[in-house]
Curated annotation (Swiss-Prot):
Part of a SCF (SKP1-cullin-F-box) protein ligase complex SCF(FBXO31) composed of CUL1, SKP1, RBX1 and FBXO31. Interacts (when phosphorylated at Ser-33) with CDC20, promoting ubiquitination by the APC/C complex. A motif (D box) lies at residues 50-55. This is F-box only protein 31. The lineage of its organism: Eukaryota, Metazoa, Chordata, Craniata, Vertebrata. It is found in: Cytoplasm; Cytoplasm, Cytoskeleton, Microtubule organizing center, Centrosome. It comes from Rattus norvegicus (Rat). One of its GO terms (biological process) is positive regulation of dendrite morphogenesis. Residues 50-96 form the F-box domain. GO terms for molecular function: cyclin binding; ubiquitin-like ligase-substrate adaptor activity. Belongs to the FBXO31 family. Pathway: Protein modification; protein ubiquitination.
Length: 507
């Protein structure tokens, strides 16, 4: 009881009187007639003590205020002048910078420049908090993946790039496009990082919560002394890891030159729209997320794999003139498993084609009869918590064998049929499961788009493939292993809306 009494020295005494309040009249009278063995407790219970936050010592107030969200502290400063003075304590704001934004730097060095932790929180971190996370730039059909993070005492926008074609298993590359930091007490400084001449003056405008734009105020820093030819050669080495002479395919050369001309005209003056990572569910086939995939002459692109009940969808985060960013590149029917033939028969393209086209005919007949799932019309998630993938009657007798092989961990032998091209020959030779799916193909400029049948091949938790039947082409996808902060959708509905928005921009 003595411990409780000491605690109540900084608060109302009612907490120590609970025992007395719970007694009946007889117990109270008996207790009053007994001598209390704790004089300190007797003094506290004898008279009601009143105490407020204003009476607490400054050290305790600092601890209390430092544990509150930074957004609540301005209201406390308006209570009284004492609170306002205490809230100038840098310890409070150092803790808020660390707990809310992960700033673990030694902030004491800021004292040299006259910038306080309070300035860092209010004028840098809190002011630009809405641009943290993942974004897709509006660069025509090409798109992109921007990750804005707090990095020490900077906020940096990193553009994530796929590895050089065709090394889909290599880690992602990234380069800074802009940074924000606090040089003086007045305001934060925005710098453009584009080009090869170092940081220079830039500007950021937050259009709305899920959209912002960047502008370079010194685009001459993007130019090189050797003119456009030197700029193109440098861009080609960074983008493709090779020279134009190394690329013998004429159509591929045209695509590369077209991308350089189109993307370089923006000069880092771009509009970005927020994207979210897909929500996961325990019944998902594999963990959803971002993957790098091979797309023939277009090189490597970034695709977001998400699950929607009995279907999985791959949405392009980066794109090309045929299928632009934001479009749904593949859709997989998780209720239609495909049992591959043995390796010898699998080498025969006609045999695999026969199996896939039989499934497509079943789908067509069911849709016409109204028995099967309705045709896909939009990327909205109608049933985000739908049933897990399982064998269906339409999948044929091989579905049970596929399920057994997946649970046993043995897998199925896999080899590409003769005549099927692949940018990367280093694909796994065993797979866990195969499903019927469709892929989106179109002419240049996204003309005459249509969905064509194919086979989704699941290799493991981090790799899958898609065999484009009509194109006789195989795309290999490998998971992006980077960790992204501030990228989770606030709700499944918000993720659905994001998919609709990025698709509508290029439809």
């Amino acid at each position: 009881m003595a411990v409780c009494a000491r605690l109540c020295g900084v608060g109302p005494a009612r907490g120590c009187r609970r025992r007395q309040q719970r007694r009946g009249p007889a117990e109270t009278a008996a207790a009053d007639s007994e001598a209390d063995t704790d004089p300190e407790e007797e003094r506290i219970e004898a008279g009601p003590a009143r105490c407020s936050l204003l009476e607490l010592p400054p050290e305790l107030l600092v601890e209390i205020f430092a544990s509150l969200p930074g957004t609540d502290l301005p209201s406390l400063a308006q209570v009284c002048s004492r609170f306002r003075r205490i809230l100038h304590t840098d310890t409070i704001w150092r803790r808020r910078c660390r707990e809310e934004y992960g700033v673990c730097e030694n902030l004491r060095k800021l004292e040299i420049t006259g910038v306080s932790c309070r300035d860092v929180y209010a004028k840098l971190l809190h002011r630009y908090r809405h641009i943290l996370g993942l974004w897709q730039p509006d660069i025509g059909p090409y798109g992109g993946l921007l990750n804005v993070v707090v990095d020490g005492l900077f906020i940096i926008g990193w553009m994530y790039l796929p590895p050089h074609d065709p090394h889909v298993g290599d880690p992602m590359r990234f380069k800074p496009l802009f940074r924000i930091h606090l040089m003086e007490r007045k305001s934060a400084t925005v710098e453009c990082m584009y080009g090869h001449k170092g940081p220079h003056n830039g500007h950021i405008q937050i259009v709305k919560r899920d959209e912002f734009s960047t502008k370079c105020n010194q685009t001459d820093h993007h130019r090189m002394s050797g003119g456009r030819q030197e700029e193109f050669r440098t861009w080609l080495r960074e983008e493709w890891g090779r020279t134009l002479e190394d690329i013998f395919h004429e159509h591929m050369q045209e695509l590369i030159l077209m991308k350089f001309i189109y993307t370089s005209q923006y000069d880092n003056c771009l509009t970005y729209r927020r994207i979210y990572l897909p929500p996961s569910h325990p019944d998902d086939l594999i963990k959803p997320g971002l993957f790098k995939g091979t797309y023939g002459s277009h090189g490597l692109e970034i695709v977001m794999l998400s699950f929607h009940g009995s279907r999985a969808r791959g949405t392009k985060i980066t794109g090309d003139p045929n299928i632009p960013a934001g479009q749904q590149t593949v859709e997989i029917d998780l209720q239609r498993r495909i049992q591959l033939p043995d390796v010898e028969n699998l080498r025969n393209f006609n045999e695999l084609s026969r199996i896939v086209l039989e499934v497509r005919e079943q789908v067509r007949q069911e849709q016409e009869a109204g028995e099967g799932p309705a045709p896909h019309r939009e990327p909205a998630v109608k049933d985000p918590e739908g049933p897990p993938a399982k064998a269906s009657k339409e999948a044929g007798p091989g579905a049970e064998a596929a399920e057994q092989s997946s649970t046993s961990g043995q897998g199925q032998p896999f080899v590409l049929p003769a005549g099927v091209s692949s940018r990367n020959e280093d694909y796994p030779r065993t797979c866990r499961l195969c499903f019927y799916g469709t892929g989106l193909i179109a002419g240049h400029g996204f003309t005459s788009p249509e969905r064509t049948p194919g086979v989704f091949v699941l290799f493991d938790e981090d790799r899958f493939g898609f065999l484009w039947l009509e194109l006789k082409s195989f795309s290999l996808y490998s998971r992006v292993q980077a960790t992204f902060q501030n990228a989770d959708a606030p709700s499944p509905q918000a993720f659905d809306e994001m998919l609709r928005n990025i698709q509508s921009l290029t439809s």
